Design a protein with these regions (language model features):
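Catalytic alpha-helical scaffold of carbohydrate-active enzymes acting on polysaccharides/glycoconjugates
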Residues: 1-108
Length: 108
């Protein structure tokens, strides 16, 4: 008897505002980049990925080629981007205008 198992793999990448560049760079070298290198080799694997706004900005400023690789995988349907508020607040704890602004900043 063959059974199919469906697994939803959702990853969350984050670095807090104000973290030192060398700390984020080390996380990039030890985690974010190696994961992407391995993931690209598994053509049948699909994931959902959330990257916080501050980390997305850091990638844009320091490793835009990483974002290009993510964009290519999104275009191929291999990565689904999970949206959120930019600075990862608890949305119910902040004013409505701030919720809207943070979501716009993240998707902007």
């Amino acid at each position: 008897m063959n059974q199919t198992i469906n697994l939803c793999l959702a990853l969350h990448n984050h670095q807090p505002v104000g973290n030192f560049d060398h700390v984020i760079q080390q996380a990039y070298e030890d985690s974010y980049l190696p994961f992407l290198d391995v993931f690209e080799g598994y053509n049948n694997l699909r994931i959902s990925l959330h990257t916080s706004g501050p980390l997305m900005e850091w990638f844009d400023n320091h490793h835009p080629e990483y974002l290009d690789r993510l964009a290519a995988l999104v275009s191929e349907g291999r990565i689904e981007i999970v949206g959120a508020a930019f600075y990862e607040p608890i949305l119910t704890m902040i004013p409505s205008r701030d919720r809207i602004g943070q979501i716009r900043d993240y998707t902007g």
